[in-house]
Regions:
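His/Asp/Glu-enriched, well-ordered alpha-helical/loop segment
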Residues: 112-115, 120-125, 196, 200, ...
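Histidine/acidic residue-rich metal-binding segments in metalloenzymes
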Residues: 61-76, 81-201
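Residue-level signal for inorganic ion chemistry
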Residues: 10, 128, 155, 204, ...
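Catalytic-site beta-strand/loop segments enriched in glycine and acidic/polar residues
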Residues: 1
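Active-site neighborhood of phospho(di)ester-bond hydrolases with catalytic His/Asp-centered motifs
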Residues: 19-22, 27, 51-53, 106-107, ...
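Hydrophobic alpha-helical scaffolding
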Residues: 23, 27, 131-132, 179-184, ...
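Divalent-metal coordination cores built from histidine and acidic residues
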Residues: 7-102
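Conserved beta-strand segments of alpha/beta enzyme cores
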Residues: 48, 151-153, 249
Length: 253
């Protein structure tokens, strides 16, 4: 996939703007890599595009320049596709101290890592956005943080709303994603918080091919950018996916 095909698929699915993740080749952790991506997007994109910068211990000195070209800084606190995991305190402190205060810091954080992100938000008084939340313990902790006035927001994906670990045997490698699918109880918790704690629904689109997913070493992630999988209907608390209009479990009779 490239900016041409990816944005065309987004438009086919009813989306007019995409936010591209930084775990690309090359990763968007330097001003040079960001400039390259911006140039390619300008020449090929069919809809509006914004780019995430990536946090990297080796490129901390690039944060100021990256802030001028990107919509937000994304910090990976857990393993996912690519090699952008940040697991040392000095790098985290540098990111929160040096990233422009007018820009959001987004985090891929799972389980106890969410507590790390909330703590950093409190210490540095900064807006932290948690990407693709998938567990009851995570969403309840974020709800507690919001009730205390901390500057945190979060999102959930269609696959974490509509699939669980029970679907694993049926999906095989196509059900392998990061964060991994939760339990049925986790799914229920996400629906319970959809109209209050959760700020938006996002695809976490990962454009791996069928051949890649069926290989001996399938990459995690699923392509959700252009198949009509996402169209939130916030007023009624329903979400439209390829399955049709879906009500929250507690709304069903």
């Amino acid at each position: 996939e490239d900016f041409n095909t990816g944005t065309a698929a987004a438009l086919a699915g009813g989306m007019t703007k995409i936010l591209a993740k930084p775990n690309k080749s090359p990763p968007l952790t330097t001003d040079a890599a960001m400039a390259l991506a911006v140039g390619v997007a300008r020449r090929n994109a069919r809809c509006d595009v914004a780019l995430f910068a990536g946090a990297s211990p080796e490129d901390i000195d690039q944060l100021a320049a990256l802030g001028e070209r990107s919509i937000a800084l994304k910090i990976y606190l857990n393993d996912t596709f690519g090699k952008l995991r940040v697991d040392d305190v000095p790098t985290l402190r540098a990111c929160f101290a040096r990233w422009p205060r007018s820009k959001v810091i987004a985090m891929h954080a799972e389980k106890q890592s969410v507590a790390v992100g909330i703590g950093l938000s409190a210490v540095y008084d900064r807006h932290v956005h948690f990407c693709h939340i998938s567990r009851r313990e995570e969403i309840e902790l974020i709800a507690d943080a919001k009730q205390r006035g901390l500057k945190v927001t979060c999102e959930v994906t269609p696959h974490h709303l509509f699939l669980s670990q029970e679907d694993g045997p049926r999906l095989g490698p196509f059900g392998d994603m990061r964060p991994i699918l939760g339990t049925a109880d986790d799914v229920a918790a996400l629906w319970q918080h959809l109209n209050n704690t959760i700020d938006c629904v996002a695809t976490d689109h990962a454009p791996h091919t069928r051949a890649e997913k069926l290989s001996a070493t399938p990459p995690p992630g699923v392509p959700l950018g252009g198949n009509g999988a996402l169209s939130p209907h916030a007023g009624s608390g329903h979400v439209y996916t390829h399955r049709g209009w879906q009500a929250r479990p507690d709304d069903e009779e």
